[in-house]
Amino acid sequence: MNNQTLATQYEMDFSYNPLPFFSDIEDNLKFNKKLDLNLYCIKRPKQTCFIHITNPNMLAWGIESGDMLVVEKNDDLYSGDLVVLEENNEFHVYEFMAHSGNYLFMALDSTTQNINTKRLVKFTYYRHRDQYDSSNETSR
């Protein structure tokens, strides 16, 4: 086998192949449709962005350096939401808690201070998409 043939075989073995739908596996072994996860995972694409995590200090929350957060822009804020706030041209991730008129933004970064306030200023919040699913929507 020469190098040209070996390279062609390598491309065929390791080239991108989309995952088939379960129901299509038996019917069509040569699957040619692509599955776009954005259509299924992102409800509001114009209000959604991705934030690449470079901070290694959020391991206690299961967020590692190199992870990608799916973040949705939203005007509403609920206890338990993960929110992204910009401070000094850097993004920081907090968990929002509200109790008896006190509002706490608990930093997920172990080296960042929590923010405790009695008054919320009206601004747009960026909420980590994973915390917002339709099953919790009715309980809010």
Curated annotation (Swiss-Prot):
GO terms for biological process: SOS response. Gene3D superfamilies: Umud Fragment, subunit A. It comes from the Bacteria. InterPro entries: LexA/Signal_pep-like_sf (IPR036286), Peptidase_S24_S26A/B/C (IPR015927). Belongs to the peptidase S24 family. This is Uncharacterized protein HI_1546.
